[in-house]
Amino acid sequence: MQHTVTLDENEIMLARTIASLRTGNNRVAGTSHNVQIPGQDNFRNDLLGICGEIVFAKTYNIYLDLCFHIRSGGPDFKLGNKTIDVKTTHHANGRLIVPLAKKNKPSDRYVLITGDLPTFTIRGFATSDEVFSSQGDVGHGSCFVINQENLHAFKF
């Protein structure tokens, strides 16, 4: 089962603020995104990412990590005894794409959220074993990739 969430204007303002701070700090520190796609804007990627995190936190009534300091990956959430890494794309039919480097600091679950401001849909999740046995290339270098139809449904 999929779940759709529409962010309100305060949540969108929070997302824009955190995305701006994360993008600026990364630029100052000289760090880059794990997946570089020609022509993509780092701020837009950060904005979609934090929106996905807000959607997940709002859905599960858990605290959102509001930090904007430089992070080297790792999970976005802990839900029960499972670590969760949220991946967000604006493509409605998008796939769960996980950079190769995530294998060094794996999360227990990888969640795919699709959408664009203000409405997003939680599509499902894959386990770390499923993710790390799904190496492929979506046209921008090697990564782990799982199609939506192969994701597990959440119970809401």
Predicted regions mapped to residue ranges:
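Nucleic-acid endonuclease domains
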Residues: 1-80, 87-156
